[in-house]
């Protein structure tokens, strides 16, 4: 190793390594997707379109500028699936996996990076947890693919095997990519399966399992039904996930899908409640949903899943911390609480910072796109919320946007996957963060 390489390796923080890792994989994926072998027509793909697709795959978003099923060849779809898998696991986790397979020891620096990548509380036991994550991921994806086989093989014959594998991995990684499109029926997502209980239920379960986080899996597998032994964070994630799904499903049932039979209406409402929190699949025509439902969908997209999961967004824990802080303010309590545990002041500060970052970037991006494209702000906000939340739901605008607007979505997808605080910590690493403690003074708010 050169002196410069040694210096770089040992002076980069785990946050900087994470960001450079994601950026490197995205760039490599874009270069491969440009090749004629990656497209069904065997033509070169413009760099910007390849970069958008690679970013969407690695950031497990699902927004596309070309229909995945009809534009990309089998090789191109395989590359996209590999990028989705790396993005879902996380670049650091994938790198640690290759180190394990090669028999190399995992250094303390690599363990620390892994800790940050999956939001683990301590470095100890990180290798065991990584093995658990890898085994759990491939097991769940295999079971999901086997469960989807009957439906896809019924409709597509032997090609259904590949489709079952692709959609199982994409759903578990909360990516939302589909390969069901064909000439004359582009960007279909799962609309053909709105009345298929098997496909709906399997996809929903894969999305939920992928979106609750690896540490939550560890609690569930270790303590099973002994809920009191769960980490407070796992309790918050499971409770918030259940509440968000139940409330949004009820709202969608009351405001949409009136044309469907009762059973299908319940199924469609549930699916639409699960998928906005970073999965990106849809069984219904999103453009026909009510304004209320579209507004709620935007909020769900920004909320996202759990920390240390395949999901993006602000995270349900951020929402829970802000809600607990609001309750403490209403009750004039000094400390916000969740499940009989006081929250650290740093958690409240971080939650407020994340909220401001997501709101600011999402609305700013929507405003720029609206001005550049001459489109309604609300429709643009739907696309930017989908990008920042790494969701992939769209009202059909993304493929029609210009290069500037699509570049904004690329940046938002990257921001949504690596996380706002990760970007800030990486940017300010190495700076002297000591500060003077000034006198306190009250300020009136509200």
Task: Give the positions of each predicted feature.
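Membrane-proximal intracellular helices of multi-pass ion channels
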Residues: 1-446
